């Protein structure tokens, strides 16, 4: 995820945009923030919501950060969830006041390992499905390291997980499995 965010943020900065990146992490040390530090500058700010508290506290912290960032006048705000994230929390927050007046959801991009394991628990499959259900596109990470069979298996797993949560959507052309270095 961080590699993609770094590439995407660099692209937006080259376009002259003023951006904010919100790292949503549950770890004590946020490695992602350290990896993104070199993007910081006049047109890019990094913020973090750290975990270590209950779900209600985390939702309050997340919303508070989004409110503060909403007052900064960014052209784009990139929200990076932790590896396991309740996507409903994101959508719910953006539909509450005052965020509903400041933010418009643009691109929802889900990033999934091209070599996704087959043996997920029901809970993990639920989280996986919730993360891809509303995505405009699903980017497979490390696709250049995966075989055609592994990529096909990952695509089947995504659609099976969607079916398990009674989601009628099936992913096909929304899944991008090319090397990220080839993106323009």
For each feature predicted by the language model, list its residue ranges.
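Phosphate/Mg2+-binding loops and adjacent switch elements
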Residues: 72, 76-171, 176
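Generic structural motif recognizing short loop/turn segments at the entrances and edges of beta-strands
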Residues: 42-45, 51, 165-167, 174, ...
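Nucleotide-state-sensitive switch-loop elements of NTP-binding domains
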Residues: 2-121
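P-loop NTP-binding site
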Residues: 1-10, 174-184
